[in-house]
Amino acid sequence: MGQEVREPKQERSIEKKNRIVQAGFELFSQVGYYNTNTAEIAKRAGVSTGIVYGYFKDKRDILLDVLEIYVKEAFAPVLDMINNLTAPVNFEGTIGHVLDSAINIHKKYANIHEALHSLSHSDEAVNNKFISLEDEITLAIANKLADLGVKKENLTERIHFAMDIVQSFSHEYVYDHHTYIDYDEMRKIVQNTLVALFDD
């Protein structure tokens, strides 16, 4: 563990490091971050523990690379959707797509999402990554809507508030399952609330 961490340059070494990160992604998703150790990650990746420590200082170091994968895979569709918006913006249709996408992301990445979000409260680097992602998406939407001629007072604040609503609803829809809630009706309320934030 005391050996120097190296950045792989050869194709075989890069592939080996990627296998370790993928193994970490799978194990953190399946059994959680705290229930996984580097020996298990090494075994899943088909390498020795020494190889793991050649590329990563510790398990947390692997987690930060796992977070990069999660962010790219989970949020790329949202950013693509934003980039493809055209004027005049159909907020009802767009927000419907955003809600569907958010629900699907939370379903697909349920375990890793839970693991990473629980760590965001105790790990500064993880928390900073999520804040950076929030900033990137908020500003990307604000810039795109401004380019498309959307003129709303406090646009950035509206977008950030909308993102909080989408996140909260997705958690409720995918994870919480209150028996007294009609989630289809709740989805309509959320969509109408969000449309009212942006539509004239």
Where are the predicted features?
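Alpha-helical DNA-contacting segments of helix-turn-helix folds
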Residues: E40, L64-Y70, S120, K129, ...
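Hydrophobic alpha-helical connector segments
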Residues: D65, D80-K108, G149-K152, A162
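Helix-turn-helix
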Residues: E15, R19, A23, L27-D61, ...
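Hydrophobic/aromatic-rich alpha-helical bundle segments in the mid-to-C-terminal region
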Residues: E114-L116, N127, A146-T193
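Amphipathic alpha-helical packing segments from all-alpha helical-bundle domains
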Residues: K72-L79, D100, N104-K108, E124-G149, ...
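Amphipathic alpha-helical segments used for helix-helix packing
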Residues: I82-N84, G93, I103-A125, H171-D176
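N-terminal intrinsically disordered/low-complexity leader segments
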Residues: M1-E15
